[in-house]
């Protein structure tokens, strides 16, 4: 038997080690479940890490109420089929105040419905460690963040005060009220994620596959018309195009890409040829200079 691990096997082993380390060291961990491809891989790894037992922590979805309908359907189906403990948290104050990406802009909307919503949930359930599916190849602020990312009592991240991580050793010490965000997929690339999904036959939201969908061209992006809340601006018209999504978020803030890739091998082929970041389709990354780093410093994932 060949004892050499493949590249994907090495990544899998590292991620499973990280997940088990968190469960061993923290009293009340949780896994953030955003329903995207990275969350799908992370959940698959967690199930592998503790098989045949279920993962010994719940899933948490911070619901902004603006996710694609197919994402919510997929979330509920996966939780039911896998017998998972799923916590869904909504910032009810934001809903009461009518906060939306259309009327308040992406920066304020993201802060209220995502960042504050996440902090509310972490405080409510007193989680001391939270898994997230962020990867270093996605965006420059994530590239410099540690795998075990320390957060102070108000959930803020200080990029100038990060703990060293040498020889795969992680400092898990925290004081009451402090917490750690943990990123088991830090060293994975977008291509790694797709190849692993193909290899392991991991279920993903159908929006990742190309299909003819109703879209409008807005600010240089193709925004899918997912429900009646999307109001057309003067001069806009609904078009039907073959599109898919490289990244998934709130539908008014997530751009589709024109594509005919409706199978995993075709998506992987696209990844081998593309020269653009998957997050170019996320409006929240571009609503201000240093946008993602500022959001993370305020408590965003």
Curated annotation (Swiss-Prot):
A biological process term (GO) from this entry: sulfate assimilation
UniProt pathway annotation: Sulfur metabolism; hydrogen sulfide biosynthesis; sulfite from sulfate: step 1/3
TM spans (from-to): none
Subunit (UniProt): Heterodimer composed of CysD, the smaller subunit, and CysN.
Keywords of the record: ATP-binding, Nucleotide-binding, Nucleotidyltransferase, Transferase
Family, as annotated: Belongs to the PAPS reductase family. CysD subfamily.
EC nos: 2.7.7.4
Pfam families: PAPS_reduct
Protein name: Sulfate adenylyltransferase subunit 2
InterPro entries named among the record's database cross-references: PAPS_reduct_dom (IPR002500), Rossmann-like_a/b/a_fold (IPR014729), SO4_adenylTrfase_ssu (IPR011784), Sulfate_adenylyltrnsfr_sub2 (IPR050128)
One of the record's GO molecular function terms: sulfate adenylyltransferase (ATP) activity
UniProt enzyme class: transferase
NCBIfam families in UniProt: CysD, PRK05253.1, PRK12563.1
Catalytic activity: sulfate + ATP + H(+) = adenosine 5'-phosphosulfate + diphosphate
Annotated region described as Disordered, given as residue ranges: 279-301
Coiled-coil region(s): none
């Amino acid at each position: 038997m060949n004892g050499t691990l493949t590249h994907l096997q090495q990544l899998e082993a590292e991620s499973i080690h990280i997940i088990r380390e968190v469960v061993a060291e923290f009293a009340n961990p949780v896994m953030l479940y955003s329903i995207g491809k990275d969350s799908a891989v992370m959940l698959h790894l967690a199930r592998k890490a503790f098989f045949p037992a279920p993962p010994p922590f719940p899933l948490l979805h911070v619901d902004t109420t603006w996710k694609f309908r197919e994402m919510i359907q997929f979330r509920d189906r996966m939780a039911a089929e896998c017998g998972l403990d799923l916590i869904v948290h909504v910032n009810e104050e934001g809903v009461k105040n009518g906060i939306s990406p259309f009327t308040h802009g992406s920066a304020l909307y993201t802060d209220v419905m995502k960042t504050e919503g996440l902090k509310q949930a972490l405080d409510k359930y007193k989680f001391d460690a939270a898994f997230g599916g962020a990867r270093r190849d996605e965006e420059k602020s994530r590239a410099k963040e540690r795998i075990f990312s320390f957060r102070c009592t108000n959930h803020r991240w200080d990029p100038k005060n990060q703990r060293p991580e040498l020889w795969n050793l992680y400092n898990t010490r925290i004081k009451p009220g402090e917490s750690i965000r943990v990123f088991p997929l830090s060293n994975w690339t977008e291509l790694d994620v797709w190849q692993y999904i193909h290899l392991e036959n991991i279920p993903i939201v159908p929006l990742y596959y190309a299909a003819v969908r109703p879209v409008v061209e807005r600010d240089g992006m193709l925004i899918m018309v997912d429900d009646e809340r999307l109001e057309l601006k003067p001069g806009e018209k609904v078009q039907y195009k073959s599109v898919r999504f490289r990244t998934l978020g709130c539908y008014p803030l997530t751009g589709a890409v024109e594509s005919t890739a409706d199978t995993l091998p075709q998506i992987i082929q696209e990844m081998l040829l593309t020269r653009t970041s998957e997050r170019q389709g996320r409006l929240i990354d571009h609503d201000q200079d240093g946008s993602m780093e500022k959001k993370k410093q305020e408590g965003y994932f």
